[in-house]
């Protein structure tokens, strides 16, 4: 991992925590730009895991594997980090442009080529590579996720409010 560097990627719109800001904790003199880049990747994966675990709790179901697509999915390193953080196999589909694939699936279902979306997916989606979790790495990530990442927002939330007030008062 990042030698104890943990990032909380609260910098985008749509958060249910409007005062939240991105945060990085754990810096020391051993950290390099590599650690920072990796912390960004890991932080995004932690945020996705947090969201998935919320869905699993509400649905009373456990995800057994994860399909990935998009630009980041083209990196073997990112896919492996994702598998290690989630603790389940991650597979890359045959194209990273899955929006087009999804449209084709809907179209073929609508035209009656396939009777169900499940049939269309089964026939049109191909796995190109699977990344199995390294459970030793998962244990480390799980510790950081539960003991650090999940606690960051609660511990920093008062400071986020102060930062928001500061920005309103002193921003140009």
Task: Kindly label every feature range from the protein language model.
Residues 1-172:
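Glycine/Thr-rich phosphate-binding loops that ligate phosphate moieties of nucleotide
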